[in-house]
Amino acid sequence: MTTHPEGQTAILTTPDGTRLAYRDHHPAPAEAAGPLLLLHGLAGHQGEWDALARRLRSDGHRVVTYDARGHGASTRVPASTSRAAHVRDAVTVIGELSLAPVTLIGQSLGGHTAMLLAADHPDLVRSLVLVEAGPGGPNPDLPGRIAGWLDSWPTPFTSLEQARDFLGHEAWTRTLRKRGDGWYASFDRDVMIDSVAELATTAYWPQWSRITCPTLLVQGENGTMRPGEPERMLTLRPGTHHRLIPGAAHDVHLDQPDRLHQAIRTFLRTPPASP
């Protein structure tokens, strides 16, 4: 495998030909804690994790991030947008970079991918952190809500400042593309909608129930998890740690990176017993 300068974006290719852009951040001077793989949410990109990644590196962790298929600098229109394809991508990253056993930290759709991976590949996963993510469903109105949200973007944005104000955080502006009349999303709208299609018809409680690794569930105080979902998750797996982050909405990693870092650090240093 080709090595790349610290923190620079590199590319690996999955078995179905999808190109994944990733960054491999090693701690200095030497790794003192286990590796972490961070998975972003729908319509996001790996740069969302920058603030948290810096904090985790300071704890001695090797931190790997990547753009999910259809996102960021990865293949824009991949051959598949299925949940299984997203899991295979994460498995490929883990294998190519020799990360196993790894702690998975995933937010929203990235957390869902991490959850499925932990259920299906327990040998690869040391522990699991879900940020505003869970197995609940089916959610038949989800594709329509995502379509409505994407269609509400007032593109072209006339400036990055306007985009930041609308999208809620500067991190969301970093993958916008400049055209002659303004700034546009870099992703394909239909790919985003297709990426959540299975969540409209499927619940993933069996997968959640068979996870055996130590797990932390993080909610934002003003997050968007479905009513009753966290409570059911804790009932089915009572060994799960649960943290509610004050002052955070769905994007906990952007709203409260310090508090999220503290929750993760505490969890990793005193992991709960496997259920």
Give a label for each model feature:
Residues G41-G44, S108:
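Active-site glycine-rich loops that stabilize anionic/oxyanionic intermediates
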Residues G106, G110, A114:
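Gly/Ala-rich beta-loop-alpha elbow adjacent to hydrolase catalytic centers
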Residues A248-P257, H261:
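Catalytic histidine-centered segment of alpha/beta-hydrolase-like enzymes
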Residues P143, P156-Q207:
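Conserved alpha/beta-hydrolase catalytic His-Asp/Glu region
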Residues Y184-L236, H241:
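Conserved serine/cysteine hydrolase catalytic core
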Residues A33-G41:
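Short beta-strand element of the alpha/beta-hydrolase
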Residues P15-T18, H26, D50-S58, V64-I105, ...:
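Active-site loop/oxyanion-hole signature of alpha/beta-hydrolase fold enzymes
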